[in-house]
Amino acid sequence: MPLGKYYCDYCEKQFQDTPAARKRHLDGAQHHRARALWYDAVRRQELHGGGGGAPPLLHQPGAAAIGVCQHFVRTGTCKFGDSCRYFHPKPPPANPGPAPSGPVSGPMAQQSNIQGSQPNFVGYQAADGSSFSGNILGGHTSWGNLPPSLRPPPEGGYPPFPFVDWG
């Protein structure tokens, strides 16, 4: 009976799938470097909203971004470009968007007034000129990237589904 092949997605290598060969590969320095580059790229995408910064393969193997490029921070440019081994932060947006004009009403604002402190959830900022993670227009909150199952139902309810005979 022929042995199967093992394909490592991190290293893009294929080899015979035996316990000894797999252990030898998983303990190898090249696999550790490739796996670290993969997770650094994932972490970088999460930190910078997807796709910011240089792709991990433009860096030397094992040379993940080590700190912030001070020249880029001061001048806004870097002679090394995407191959710089330091991180190039994105500047904050110049106009973050309209802030709510009046007091914010709702359960989170009431909780804030009752406890005397800000509620602890991501994207919240105080109602004194800053905004929530979604835009507040006419008392309605934009729920952003929430999946449909986590969004509140529409004000008028859901439309009725057409009858389907499963007979």
UniProtKB/Swiss-Prot annotation:
It holds the Pfam family zf-U1. Residues 108-120 have a biased composition (Polar residues). A zinc finger (C3H1-type) spans 63-91. Gene3D superfamilies: Classic Zinc Finger, Zinc finger, CCCH-type. The keyword Metal-binding applies. Keywords: DNA-binding, Metal-binding, Zinc, Zinc-finger. The keyword Zinc-finger applies. InterPro entries: Matrin/U1-like-C_Znf_C2H2, U1-CZ_Znf_C2H2, Znf_C2H2_sf, Znf_CCCH, Znf_CCCH_sf. It comes from the Eukaryota. Residues 89-101, 149-167 have a biased composition (Pro residues). Residues 89-167 are annotated as: Disordered. Disulfide bonds: none annotated. GO terms for molecular function: DNA binding; zinc ion binding. GO terms for cellular component: U12-type spliceosomal complex. This is Zinc finger CCCH domain-containing protein 3. It comes from Oryza sativa subsp. japonica. The lineage of its organism: Eukaryota, Viridiplantae, Streptophyta, Embryophyta, Tracheophyta.
